[in-house]
Amino acid sequence: MDEALIQEQERQLQKTGRYYRHVFWLCVPLLCMACYFYGARPLLLCGIALLTGNLCDRLVALLRHRVYTNKDLSNESFSLIIALLMPATVDIYVLVVAVLAGVLIGKEVFGGYGSYPFNPAAVGYAVAAVSWPEQVVRYPQPYTPLPLWDASAVPVSSTIEDTLRSGGILNLNALAVVLGEFAAPMGTGAALVILACGLVLWTQKDVHIGASASFLITCGLIAFFFPRQVGLADSTLFSSLMPRLQGVRDELHTGAMLFCAVFLLNEPYTCAHHRLGRILYGALVGIATMGFRYFGVYETGVCFALLAVNSVSALIDRTEERLYRLLHRLPSERKEAAE
């Protein structure tokens, strides 16, 4: 492996390695919630995902003739995120393929640490969702007893997405929504825990709030002004205020929206790097996400939206840099001309 690239990756690891360490450990509370809802199977799935991601890291180190270091937890954090985006009933081979796709195709193919243009966790999830939709986008109800190894006989459904897509309103009380007591990916329903994790990442200066806030605000505004619920779009704004707000609640708390806003959107190497760029980046992901949710076939369309906007995040950065230089060059040129 090129020595200059190795040194650059070591510098990047010193710069952003703490982000992945924090994400790794903050996935643990969500895993605990998943175990509370579904028993020991989420622990088994996350353990297998971690082992797969770590073995990929060691294999790539061997192939590239470099020393493996346990300071880099990016593979492990991507693996945990992929596992938490899965239903607790997913077959083990599907999860393993998703982790392999995310780590090897989403990350290592592009050069490894810090060189990838697409979020590796979103890549892994997208590959699994497209290849095995019946496994990835159908979920068991919380508190359903799950066998440890083979959960193929457990009843699963896509009730949440079916209800929203047909123009209905979720029959869930507020406490059930914020605690995640509904059929969803095993680590994405507990809104209170996810928000607490986001607060920790923000206080540790691992993430910037601009991208996440603009993403959630954009999704909320679209859900409020263009609701999917039957009859709301044709009614006046004030006469349907409460149903519209409930629709916003339902949209933001399902489909792994909050989870992705905290754990995927601010990934250091795929998010825009400047303040205005991050706001635009989050808004674009929000627009694309609602487009996928309204017109697509996957409840977790946010992962596909993220991949789509990842393709232009570098362009957003370059455009902002050019505008910044242009706006600061014009006053200096005028000043020089006046002198």
Predicted regions located by residue number:
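N-terminal signal-anchor module of multipass membrane proteins
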Residues: M1-A61, E333-E339
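Cytosolic-side transmembrane-helix boundaries in multi-pass membrane proteins
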Residues: M1-H22, F292-E339
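C-terminal ends of transmembrane helices
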Residues: Q7, L55-V67, V103-G114, A196-Q204, ...
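Hydrophobic, membrane-inserted alpha-helices
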Residues: L26-M33, G53, D57, N75-L84, ...
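Structural signature of hydrophobic alpha-helical transmembrane segments
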Residues: G39-L51, T89-A98, E181-A191, P243-M257
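Cytoplasmic-side transmembrane-helix entry/capping segments in multi-pass membrane proteins
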Residues: Y68-F78, L95-L100, S115-Y125, I209-I217, ...
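Long hydrophobic alpha-helical segments that form multi-pass transmembrane helix bundles
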Residues: S115-L195
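Loop-to-transmembrane alpha-helix initiation sites
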Residues: P117-A121, R249-M257, R278, G296-V309
